[in-house]
Amino acid sequence: MGRGWDWADMLAYTVSGYGVVSMDVRGQSGYSQDGLRSPLGNTVKGHIIRGAVEDREHLFYKDVYLDIYQLVEIIASLPQVDEKRLSSYGASQGGALALVAAALNPRIQTTVAIYPFLSDFRRVLEIGNTSEAYDELFRYFKFHDPFHETEEEIMETLAYIDVKNLAHRIKGEVKMITGLDDDVCYPITQFAIYNRLLSHHA
């Protein structure tokens, strides 16, 4: 979906006593838009590869990760928030961003990540294109670099946003949920995150 859930979907958390903050990812059809750097409306493909040809500073997800960090800082500064009890939660892209939030900001004490996306891009290339989620990687090489002459450079750049490379930074407790028959966010790419966690995890 690429955007925060509808508020009605979060009522179960609020009636359980949790304060809830939801983030729209820039340029992905949420209620808030980043008109300066992302087009208005929805974009489905191109987020992973965007900026990878230039360098890691131009990566789309680098900016999204900075958004996540800033969001945690804003939440922690609110007077009604106990910054020692912050958690992150999400599924797919949201699962990846929940882990990124915990990796970049040690204020996050617990994280629940359901079938997290954005991990082990090299393994994704080895598996082959079976789903829309990573299609843009294969389309890049098919149409722009069919001989894979830039593959090493692209993979090195994408390593900067690969969630598995951030996993060791997480200090809080992590719970991960996956499906072993997931052909969108492949389980083996999720294990790459799980196996690099140094904090308590299940």
Predicted regions and their residues:
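Cap/lid segment of the alpha/beta-hydrolase catalytic domain
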Residues: 5, 11-14, 19-66
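Gly/Ser-rich "nucleophile elbow"/oxyanion-hole loop immediately N-terminal to the catalytic nucleophile
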Residues: 47-92
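Short glycine-enriched nucleophile-adjacent loop
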Residues: 76, 89, 95-106, 111, ...
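Active-site nucleophile elbow and catalytic-triad environment of alpha/beta-hydrolase enzymes
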Residues: 149-166
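Short beta-strand/loop motif that positions the catalytic acidic residue
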Residues: 169-170, 176-178, 182
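Conserved alpha/beta-hydrolase "acid-adjacent" motif
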Residues: 183-189
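Catalytic histidine neighborhood in serine/cysteine hydrolases
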Residues: 194-202
